[in-house]
Amino acid sequence: MKAIFRKENGLKDSPLISDVLVFEDPIAKENKRLIGLTDGGLIPLPDLETKIEMTRSAVKVFHKLGFEKPKVAYISAVEKVSPKIQSTVDAAEIQKRKENGQLEDINAYLEGPYAIDNVISEYAAKIKGIDSVMAGNADILVMPNIESGNILGKIANYWGNAANGHVITGAKVPVLITSRADDAKTKLNSVALGILVSMK
C-alpha cells in the first residue's frame, strides 16, 4: 500500500484510495445477486466528502460489473435523521445533493439513511413502510465506519458463507488486500475483480 501513496510512483488515479468488498447475497435463495460494501478495510471514520468519494469509487466498480445504475444505500442504526447520529446527517445530505443535481456525475441512486434491514429485506422494508427502490434491494452499502464495514463483511463470509472478493479503488493498477484467513477461492475472486476493474 505504501507504494501507492508515494507521489513519485504516480500510481494514484483518484483523490481517495478505498476498499470495496463485493459478495453474493447470502439471503437470496434464488436469483443470486451481488452486493457491494465500502469501506471495511481502509478508511476508519469517513466524513461527508469522503463518503461521496467512496461512493464514486464503488459505483465505478459496479458499472464494470454490468450495473447500469446501481442502488447505493447509506447505512446507519436508524432510517430517520438524528442530529446525535452523524451518519444519518451525512446520508440525508448526500441524498439531498443528489436530488438537487449536485452529484450528477455519479450514475446511481443515492439514498439514506437506512437501517440495514430496510435495504436487504423486503419484508422489513414493508413493515416499516419504506417505499423506495432500495427496499430490500440495495446494490451498494456505504457503511458509517470501518468497524461496521469490517464486521458485516466477515459475517457475510463466515456466517453467510457468501462468495466474495475485495478490490482497492483509486489506483492506476489492480491492488488487492486480502485477509490472512482468506481461502484460495476468495483470493482468486479478488484477483478477477481487480483485473475487471482495471480494464478500460
What is each of the regions a protein language model found here?
Residues M1-M134, I140-M143, S148-K200:
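Anion-binding alpha/beta catalytic cores of soluble intermediary-metabolism enzymes, centered on
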